[in-house]
Amino acid sequence: MLQVIPTTLDVANDLVAQWHRHHPPVVGYRFALLCIDEIGLPHGVVIVGRPVSRMIDQYRVAEVSRLATDGHKNACSILYGAAARVAKAMGFQSIQTYILDSESGVSLKASGWQFKAISDGGTWSREQRERKQKAPTNQKLKFTKTLNQKAADLVLRKKEKAQFELFGC
């Protein structure tokens, strides 16, 4: 039977380097979780951090930046579910992740995540700032899970109130 325990970024990145098909280890994180069996062997790891997009509020949204497994059955679903529970306990309103358009997302769906959008993909490289591309640049599928609906509703009400005040209502 698999269980989830917290882990360090160093341990998580070592496993990402071994198992992840197309991304290198990460630089920063908020938390990382390890999926182990009854004798303590690791079968998967998830690293959760700030959203990559600057347009998304890093204090309200957590983002799964890496999830890697050795192929053990249900490890992905277990880790996605555990990451959402930890992010909820930390007070985040939602959690999100992006997967390749060639991946099914069945583990995310099994963990209660919902498909939200298709991103354009692309690269962070620009003429003014060339960057070496290491990851696939094709379209990505965005999945999210709402964690603290009351907090999300409160934020929406505050935004609506600010809009009414702006127009003198």
Which positions does each model-derived feature cover?
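Acyl-donor binding region in acyl/amide transferases
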Residues: P6, R30, I36-D37, G49-Q139
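C-terminal "cap" of GNAT-fold acetyltransferases
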Residues: W124-E160
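Secondary-structure transition/hinge residues
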Residues: H20, P24, H72, K88-G91, ...
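Short, cationic low-complexity segments
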Residues: R157-C169
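Short amphipathic alpha-helix that is part of the acyltransferase structural core
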Residues: M1-V26
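Conserved beta-hairpin
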Residues: V16, Y29-V46
